[in-house]
């Protein structure tokens, strides 16, 4: 009982330890996932901060590049001129900047298209040149290539013929082995049949010999029985004769009695 309790307690401990290990592995996996998500979030934040900084730097650079706004103008009556003109100038500058940016982007796209066309044309010309060079080289080495092709064809034919002959030889050997196995099997069957026939003949001969012995014994017994019967018949006849003599000796006037016994078959 004590051993069973200790075993059950050790098993429960192993089960509990396995559960704790699973919980620990799960908690570690969750911690790894949290760390990965935090690192990804921090990377995203850093990217956003860098983008915002670049945007702010660009805006500040544009502000610095812009010319200083002129001071407020005063008309002849001593009143400040409306800021509408300055706003118009600002809007005009922005439109000019947009146009300049659009023109710059257009030039970049145009340049990219031209570069792509040049690259495609260059690739086409290189391909044509390579094809032409290959054709010229093939034309120069036509005879050599034909000889090499013929050599390889002949070599392939020799290899195929050799493989075919080897395959035919393997098939022939396999057929010979199968035929030999069949002959061995047939020979074994014949030997088994001959053994069975010999065994049957031996059994028949033994049975015939036993039957002949039994017949001889029966004949001998019959002969002995016949001899015993003959002896008994002779003994009976002798006794009958003696009895007749005795009877005749006592009374000679009596007629003779004749007795006869039938021999049993």
From Swiss-Prot:
Its function, per the record, reads: Dual function regulator of gene expression; regulator of transcription and modulator of alternative splicing. General coactivator of nuclear receptor-induced gene expression.
Recorded family membership: Belongs to the ARGLU1 family.
Name listed for the protein in its UniProt record: Arginine and glutamate-rich protein 1
Q: Which GO terms describe its cellular component?
A: chromosome; mitochondrion; nuclear speck; nucleoplasm
Q: Which residues cross the membrane?
A: none
- Pfam families per record: ARGLU
Region Disordered, as annotated, extends over 1-105, 172-192, 229-265
Give the location in the cell. Nucleus; Nucleus speckle; Chromosome
| Domain text | The N-terminal region can bind RNA; preferentially binds 5'-CGG[AG]GG-3' motifs.
What is this protein's gene name?
A: arglu1
- Broad class of the protein's primary localization: nucleus
Q: Where is this region: Necessary and sufficient for transcriptional regulation?
A: 67-265
The residue ranges flagged as biased composition, category Basic and acidic residues, are: 60-76, 85-105, 180-192, 229-245
Q: Please give the residue ranges the record annotates as the region Necessary and sufficient for RNA binding.
A: 1-66
What Gene Ontology molecular-function terms does this entry list? Answer: cadherin binding; pre-mRNA binding; transcription coactivator activity
